[in-house]
């Protein structure tokens, strides 16, 4: 059903090429995507990061990101509060997508082969 919802959205908005996405601000794209049943914040953020190549996205709901940032910044075993995670990620603006990639890599022991 979610695939059908996405297809219907594309059809009703006459989305048939990349210019629909690449000529708009990501905040507007994000707001539009999360209105489609089956697409939530995480999916919209991944779309922005990996398809649109947005450089300043920090997926706060990503479990890998939260695990990595807690491994690096957690004190005395107490998980960071979301406000602390936001404050840390704010230091990485406007390149939080790159920071996200490094955080993911920090918890993944497998080499990436290009």
Please provide the spans of the model-predicted regions.
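Short amphipathic alpha-helical interaction segments
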Residues: 21, 25, 35, 39, ...
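Short, well-structured alpha-helical segments
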Residues: 1-8, 41-48, 82-86, 100-103
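Catalytic DNA-binding helix-loop module of base-excision-repair DNA glycosylases/AP lyases
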Residues: 25-71
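Alpha-helix boundary/capping residues
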Residues: 6-10, 36, 72, 92, ...
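Short helix-capping/linker segments at secondary-structure and domain boundaries
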Residues: 11-15, 52-57, 106-114
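A basic, often C-terminal nucleic-acid-binding module that engages the phosphate backbone, implemented
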Residues: 28, 74-114
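Substrate-binding clefts and substrate-entry loops adjacent to catalytic sites
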Residues: 16-17, 71-76
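Alpha-helical ds-nucleic-acid-binding substructure associated with the helix-hairpin-helix region
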Residues: 1-35
